[in-house]
Curated annotation (Swiss-Prot):
Domain of life: Bacteria
Reaction catalyzed: XTP + H2O = XMP + diphosphate + H(+); dITP + H2O = dIMP + diphosphate + H(+); ITP + H2O = IMP + diphosphate + H(+)
Entry EC number(s): 3.6.1.66
Positions with a binding annotation for Mg(2+): D73
Family annotation (NCBIfam families): RdgB/HAM1 family non-canonical purine NTP pyrophosphatase
Keywords: Hydrolase, Magnesium, Metal-binding, Nucleotide metabolism, Nucleotide-binding
Protein name: dITP/XTP pyrophosphatase
Amino acid sequence: MKILIATGNRDKLQEIAQIFSDHEVMGYHEIMEPFEIIEDGESFQANAIIKAKAIHERLSAQDRARYLILSDDSGISVPLLHGEPGIYSARYAGEPLSSKRNLQKLIEEIQKRGAERTPAHYTAAMAMILEGRIYTVHGWMHGEAIIAPRGERGFGYDPMFIPQGENRTLGEMEESEKNAISHRAKALKLARKLLQSLTKTEG
């Protein structure tokens, strides 16, 4: 089964390829011109479905039968900030899009509330389209957001997030350690199990 991922983000592609190591994984831009997808859903799940459907609609009938389409939408939510940045995690600081600016804005917003660390959680929603049908799964990772980032690994908000039961930030962890506990890894593992059950049923 070939898996077509609705992203051009190399970090995401690498993480997905590790989980689906027994499948051929490729970004959608490898078979079509990249295009802008308007993510105007009101939840992570809605945005994941929007992305998957946008790719599906551009495939030929032959390619729709050849590929499983997999998309995700994910982000960090901080209860102290009434759930921000949430679905706006990737564009929290506005244009031009920048992970560093997003990170700094979240730090500043937490600081404004007089906190040095506060509960936070990541959500990952995955949407799969297989033979025209849409399936979704979710994964979560709970922990704390801190205002003093640590570590150079990972991406996004990783240097300021400490997973539950850990003393290190995601930015201080090896990729293999992060992938064992991350919200996206949990959702991907569920997606893999779902794919296995679907292909067995169809077989």
